[in-house]
Every structure is written in C-alpha cells, then in structure tokens.
Regions:
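Short loop/turn segments that connect beta-strands within beta-propeller blades
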Residues: 127-129, 172-175, 213-215, 261-263, ...
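Extracytoplasmic beta-rich repeat domains
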Residues: 88-107, 135-153, 179-196, 218-243, ...
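Blade-level signature of beta-propeller repeat domains, shared across WD40, Kelch, NHL, RCC1
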Residues: 417-439
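Bacterial signal peptide processing site
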Residues: 24-26
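N-terminal secretory signal peptides and thylakoid transit peptides that target proteins
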Residues: 2-18
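Blade/loop signatures of beta-propeller domains
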Residues: 34-44, 53-87
C-alpha cells in the first residue's frame, strides 16, 4: 500500500468513525489554513407543495439476518417494544475506539444474537436470556495488523464473517465451527451481503468480490475504482444491496454500479462523485452508507454531496438533491428519511424527491458554546418512529409524521450504530462492547 493510500485511508477512517477520539480536553490550535474536506451544502429546502408524511403499518420481524435486515436494506416500519425496559445485557468482547472501531451490526437469527467485537471475535448469545452460547476468535495465528472493517451476515444455518485481517469465514451458526475460509485480496470495507447462494462484499481497493455460499468458491468480481489503481476510501462502509436479480454496490470513487448478480455483467453506473474541486487526496466522493432498494428504486447518499434515487433496472435518475452523508437512507412506504453530515434529518417523498420536513438533531455536547460535535447514527424506523443513536450515548425517538424529537434516553455508552429490531426486542451495541436487549 502506497504512502498516499495510507494517508487517505487514515483521513477517511477518521471521517467515517465520527470523531471517536474527541474529548472535552482543550487542545492547542494547529497553525495554518483550515481546508474543508466536505462541501458545506446547506440544508435541503422543505417544499411548500410536499405531501404530508404517511406510513405503512408496523410489521414484526422474526429475524435480522444481515445488515439492515435484508439484502435490499429496506426493513421498512418494523414493530418493536414500546418501551426501553432492559431485558438483558451482555459483553461482546473488546470495545471500539479511534483506531479500532466497533462498527459491525449485531444480527438475530436461529434464536441467537450474533455480535462481533473490535478484534473481530464473534460471539453468539441466547435471544431469550443473553447467555453466551459460543465464542470464536477469527484472528489468524501470526497476524500483526489491527482489525478494521468487516461484519457479518447469516444465511441457511451459516454465519458469514468478513474481518479486517483480510478473510471471509463461514461458520456453523449453532456452534461457531469454521466451515470454510477464503483469503481476500485486501481487507474488507463491508460486511458480507447474502442473496441465495451468492455472498458479496467490497474490499479496500474498491473491488467487489463474490463467493459461493456453500463452498466458498470465488465467483465474478468487479472493480469500482476510478483513476489511480488501488486508491482507497472510507475504511468501513455499507454492504452491497440486492433485488430482482440485480446487485447494487457503492464505491470510494463515488460510483454506484448495478450488476447482473449471476454473471457480474454491468447493467448501469451512476456517479455520486464530488465536484468540490479539491486535490484528489482530499476530494472525497465515497458512498459510505449502504444503498437501499425499495419498489424498484435505488437510494444512496455520498460524501460527494449527492443523494439520489435511481431506477433499479434502467439506471435513470428519479430525483437528486445536493447533500452529504454517511448513513443509509431509511425507506418506509412512500418516504425516504435522510440524515446528512450536519446532523439534519429530512423526510423526502420517494416518488419525486420533495422534502416534507426537516429536523436539526443536536449537533454539540455543549450547544451554548458549540463544543464537542455530536454524530448521530441511523435512522431506522420502529413503531412509526425514527430511531437514532449518538456519540454522546443517547438514543432518540423522532416522530416520523411531524419531524420532531419525542424523547431521548441515555445509553450505557456512546453508540456508533443504530439499533436492530426483531424477535420482539430492540438490540443496541454500544462502543464499550455492551450489547443491550430492550423489551
């Protein structure tokens, strides 16, 4: 890896982790001119003729087997507990920090909750009691590198784990036994995505890799890199999405690509790249949040100041806005809910892009002095409310119809992931490695 790649990866990793190392201790000012790395796009304008937000009824999920619940990344309005009574807590292992973030979403399947710690050690817990069922280290015997990136996905009794040690591992979900493992070209940027017999992920050099779920045999591959070969981006990003035989992936280059899931043949590409005009080492265009597919349309947001809806089959733009963000959009019924990098939350009509409401989430620990910037993760929708978590260690519930914060509750620690909702529980992993089940 070149020095340029390492510098850019370090900068982008810092960006994607949402200032994990920030603290209240005063630091001396660094001399020199400050150069913004993200464009200040301003807020999306609420349209006077935008329709009022409507929502579909909440539906219960028995499982949450992969990132954002399913291969399309569109769980919708999920039914969950109406309160936050702690049902159980468990320690998953090593907590996250600036150098080793804890960004793998927990999963629920086969009456087990799966979690991965900052060292990529995987644990399974009873969904009923939180008692540990099995624990497995994925660290190779002679590994010297730190784990950054990766995640998990479940399918047909198997748990698929991508690790920052540059491996994809298939385990028996019931006991953690390794069934097969594949060495990757580079460490992964994403968790695996499973669609039938296909396992797909993206590695750090912007290469999309596929594997046979049963045997681990490598399949087709596709490069999303543009320009300098091997250039890299944000270290931890969202998994590819799948629907109607089409796999959609976002890359560090700002390219959103749709591919035939069977052959890897490109169907279309759209650019979410920045026109910010910085040097290539600073001009960030990464599509960090996972793309979402709903009703034949793909939704994604990039660091290149683009949020766009694209027809899944043709690649035609449905609508586009100028906004920068790292969180996957939340789709529910006829509306998309968008969180931008200024911690503004928007309700956008999915058909035409009209903005129905905008809400400024708290931006700072100290709002008066505007110190201690906050980062919010999410949203996901539970019982018709948008749920977000913060780097201050709070969980917020937002009225999705009106765009107002209904309540906030303190978590046991800061959170860099939104919760998952399945099996009658709300499950939250916090930065200190604590997994909490609410009922």
């Amino acid at each position: 890896m070149t020095k340029h790649m390492m510098r850019r990866r370090t900068a982008l990793t810092t960006l994607s982790l949402g200032l994990l190392a920030s603290c209240s201790t005063a630091k001396p000012k660094i001399p020199g001119a400050q150069v913004p790395v993200l464009p200040d796009t301003g807020a999306l304008a609420v349209a006077v003729d935008a329709p009022a937000v409507t929502l579909p009824p909440a539906h219960a999920l028995a499982s949450w087997p992969q990132q954002l619940a399913n291969a399309a990344h569109a769980p919708g309005n999920v039914a969950g507990p109406t309160g936050l009574a702690v049902h159980w807590t468990a320690l998953v292992g090593m907590g996250g920090g600036f150098r080793q973030p804890l960004l793998a979403s927990p999963l629920l399947a086969q009456d087990l909750v799966f979690a991965m710690d900052a060292n990529a050690a995987v644990s399974a817990f009873s969904v009923a009691t939180g008692h540990p069922v099995w624990h497995a280290s994925t660290r190779p015997k002679h590994a010297t590198e730190q784990n950054i990136g990766g995640g998990m996905a479940y399918g047909s009794g198997r748990l698929y784990v991508s690790t920052g040690y540059g491996e994809l591992i298939a385990m028996a979900a019931g006991n953690g036994k390794v069934l097969w493992r594949q060495k990757l070209d580079f460490p992964p940027r994403t968790a695996p995505m499973i669609a039938g017999s296909l396992v797909a992920l993206i590695v750090q050099n912007d290469l999309l890799l596929t594997f046979d779920a049963e045997s681990g045999t490598p399949g087709w591959r596709f490069t999303g890199a543009v320009g300098t070969p091997g250039s890299t981006g944000v270290a931890v990003t969202g998994a590819p999405a799948f629907a109607d035989g089409i796999l959609v992936a976002g890359f560090a280059s700002g390219t959103l690509a749709a591919l035939n899931a069977n052959s890897g043949t490109p169907i279309w590409e759209q650019s979410y790249a920045s026109a910010f005009g910085q040097a290539s080492s600073l001009d960030f265009s990464d599509i960090v949040g996972a793309p979402v597919i709903a009703k034949g349309v793909v939704y994604a947001i990039s660091l290149g100041a683009t949020v766009m809806a694209v027809d899944l089959h043709s690649g035609a733009k449905v609508w586009t806005h100028t906004a920068t963000g790292t969180q996957a959009l939340c789709l529910a019924g006829d509306f998309a809910f968008v969180l931008d990098h200024n911690q503004m939350l928007f309700a956008v009509h999915a058909d035409d892009g009209l903005v129905s409401w905008a809400l400024q989430m708290p931006q700072f620990h100290n709002m008066k002095k505007k110190t201690g910037p906050l980062q919010w993760a999410g949203p996901v929708m539970v019982n018709g409310q948008l749920v977000l978590t913060s780097s201050r260690g709070e969980i917020a519930f937002v009225d999705a119809l009106q765009g107002r914060i209904k309540s906030t509750t303190k978590l046991v620690a800061p959170a860099d992931l939104p919760p998952i909702a399945a099996g009658g529980l709300l499950l939250q992993l916090t930065r200190n490695g604590t997994l909490t089940a609410y009922s």
